[in-house]
A protein has these predicted regions:
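Two-metal-ion RNase H-like nuclease active-site motif
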Residues: 1
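Nucleotide/phosphate-binding catalytic cleft detector across ATP-hydrolyzing
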Residues: 6-58, 63-167
Length: 167
């Protein structure tokens, strides 16, 4: 397992700190004790706080693990020549999200990616809102990880008084 840390200035996006270090803890083994990972993270948190002269209060994480699961769906709606609105898209995504969670107990959705919009048989990369259409569909990819792994990672940061905003 390797840990990559990047700290960016929130005003200008400039990279302040970046480092990759190796760790023998295998986060892919969700039953393993994560003490070494915890020690490395505590050390890196201290380094980052020293370098930035600020306490870390919250983090956004990217986690790669063989325990992640990817589920793709295509959702279709007959729109009856009405205007396509953001609320229509959000409703479909929320409905799919609930179905995914019901079917995958003990998993957490960490990412929802819309890979394609198809409106009246025309493909779009970006959703054209407020356009009349007969029907539309979305291709969505959900990325999940086990809740137990998510809780272990959050616990490590919580011990250091850091909130995990998003994984």
């Amino acid at each position: 397992t390797s840990i990559s840390i990047g700290i960016f200035n929130s005003q200008n996006g400039k990279n302040i700190f970046s480092e990759t270090c190796s760790c023998t803890t295998n986060i892919n083994n969700i039953n393993q004790d994560l003490n070494q990972l915890e020690n490395i993270l505590e050390k890196k948190i201290f380094e980052v706080e020293k370098k930035t002269k600020n306490f870390l209060n919250e983090v956004y994480l990217m986690v790669e693990t063989s325990y992640s699961n990817s589920i793709g769906l295509s959702l279709f709606k007959d729109n009856e020549d009405n205007l396509l609105q953001k609320k229509d898209i959000l409703y479909l995504i929320q409905d799919a999200r609930q179905q995914i969670l019901r079917a995958n107990k003990n998993q957490s959705i960490i990412h929802i990616l819309i890979t394609k919009y198809i409106i009246d048989l025309n493909e779009f990369d970006i959703l054209p809102l407020d356009k009349k259409c007969k029907n539309f569909s979305l291709d969505i990819k959900f990325i999940l990880i086990p809740e137990i792994l998510l809780k272990k990672i959050e616990k490590i940061f919580n011990k250091n008084h850091i909130v995990v905003k998003k994984i």
